[in-house]
Amino acid sequence: MDTFITRNFQTTIIQKAKNTMAEFMEDPELQPAMLFNICVHLEVCYVISDMNFLDEEGKAYTALEGQGKEQNLRPQYEVIEGMPRNIAWMVQRSLAQEHGIETPKYLADLFDYKTKRFIEVGITKGLADDYFWKKKEKLGNSMELMIFSYNQDYSLSNESSLDEEGKGRVLSRLTELQAELSLKNLWQVLIGEEDIEKGIDFKLGQTISRLRDISVPAGFSNFEGMRSYIDNIDPKGAIERNLARMSPLVSVTPKKLKWEDLRPIGPHIYNHELPEVPYNAFLLMSDELGLANMTEGKSKKPKTLAKECLEKYSTLRDQTDPILIMKSEKANENFLWKLWRDCVNTISNEETSNELQKTNYAKWATGDGLTYQKIMKEVAIDDETMCQEEPKIPNKCRVAAWVQTEMNLLSTLTSKRALDLPEIGPDVAPVEHVGSERRKYFVNEINYCKASTVMMKYVLFHTSLLNESNASMGKYKVIPITNRVNEKGESFDMLYGLAVKGQSHLRGDTDVVTVVTFEFSSTDPRVDSGKWPKYTVFRIGSLFVSGREKSVYLYCRVNGTNKIQMKWGMEARRCLLQSMQQMEAIVEQESSIQGYDMTKACFKEDRVNSPKTFSIGTQEGKLVKGSFGKALRVIFTKCLMHYVFGNAQLEGFSAESRRLLLLIQALKDRKGPWVFDLEGMYSGIEECISNNPWVIQSAYWFNEWLGFEKEGSKVLESVDEIMDE
């Protein structure tokens, strides 16, 4: 931790933090976590101060706005934090006296010359709101509060006291520090600022003690027994000792690997007796239908946006006599339709709230009251009918054509642009010119890719869902599924459907909240009925598109998600980073061969090189070539699909199949790899190929690729034989 602090903070900040600890008789050597917290706190205070200025008339400027006017500007905030305590108190009393305000009972961190208010700054590992109210209870209204969390949220008593750029700088720095700490395995040992405050010792009562004893993991009878086991366990050398005991029983015979030893993975994916893998993404992707409404580009509340879109398509909004096209196994179509009508009425009314009434059909859809009942261990032991539920093993499925179709459609170009990326400043160093050029080419390809529209829809929806889940835990809320796209210079609000959030008392990260989705589509589910067993589908009307009448369907599904999945959904834009890194690796490789920057040559062409082409798929058993831009869109779409269908099966498949890929690469490089228990490795891979659409499709593509590689190896062997002769 000491090395980490030295490397990540300025010397002056570290010295001030150490001086602060010395005043309280604390030793930085013994308490590095406290030193880190003080350094972070100090740095945040300086970031806030360095970003905001006032001129002689008291007008506020940010650092960017004040460029060229530095002579007439002074800091808006006086930093009190970091001063010796006696000097800090003197400064605080002087400022209060000078500006005619009451001196706070506690020492502040900052003083705002504009509002003439003292400010307390707080940093927390938990929720910003929780720490805010903890501080508020202690300080009252004696000073303003600015609370920032490593979880990327904040809470300000005065929202106008800090602009968006200032908030962004602070949160970005906290995220950076958290990532660095996690990398060094220091994050878990770090104590939050709020945890340093002293607690209260109390004796455990009988009820709490009993609850503690029945909460221990299986295999332990009570808490004291578990604590005794942990205190006496010796983890050092345990693995080595067990391996030594097993060694006489293990017989390993290495074998040199040949191309003939490799076989396709997951043979069951070709078994036509198995059902096709169903669509199980959280939202519709290529089958989505957005109700478009032209807008001026101003920000709107989601309810206002949805209301305007529904008003434009009133025939769909007012439909009361739908046609049931398809029904999922456990669905109650009448309840689902009633819930949809309630959603439409909630959005269409004049009230600002989007809260839904807790009707019996809403309770059915959200699973209200259907949670498992917890029973004491003593009762369960005495009752012979009580037993552990058998684990549910996923059913095996075969490959489905719709996955490849989704891939093809999502990687195509459209006329709509939905990608929302922040602006970056002008280039300074020569390397930044290269980066900007590559970014320009990359964004031009990705901007109008269908996958980027779907990605932004996921980002916006999961952001709204997480906000509503935290803000309205006990309420049912209607959440519009929206996006904003730009087409030929015009902005359009898009409404893809509505969702209903159930009760969301999410204490743990894996606690589930029920979400019922209602999404518009022009795809008739009967065309590929094997794709939609999880959906109940109604036909709710038709629209005229380019002079042709198209039926509009409402796809309904009862689903669930948790905090972890919602947070990943908010960060789905990370797919851009991964695809851009792969693009840059290809460009760098080409540039190193040619001896100069090949960015333009890869995307278009230059005076010497024609544009690059890459294998992007197969058609009728032959490889299909595509441009560099097309290959980039395919990579980006694959990254998105990896996020959308990500689960334990995909994680396991990726990890296990990586070993097989390394063996194939070694064969291609003619390194003569040796293996043992090859069939065991295949078994580990195939265990993960069950009912995840992306895993099954990846296995299908892998088998195709393996076939091509085997054919190529035969050609090379024939060439070698001719050369030997």
Swiss-Prot record:
Keyword Iron-sulfur carried by entry: no
Residues bound to Mn(2+) 1: 41, 109, 120-121
Disulfide bonds: none
GO biological process, one term: viral translational frameshifting
Enzyme class, first EC level, given as a word: hydrolase
Keywords of this entry: Cap snatching, Endonuclease, Eukaryotic host gene expression shutoff by virus, Eukaryotic host transcription shutoff by virus, Host cytoplasm, Host gene expression shutoff by virus, Host nucleus, Host-virus interaction, Hydrolase, Inhibition of host RNA polymerase II by virus, Manganese, Metal-binding, Nuclease, Phosphoprotein
Family indicated by similarity: Belongs to the influenza viruses PA family.
Protein's name in the database: Polymerase acidic protein
Designated gene of the protein: PA
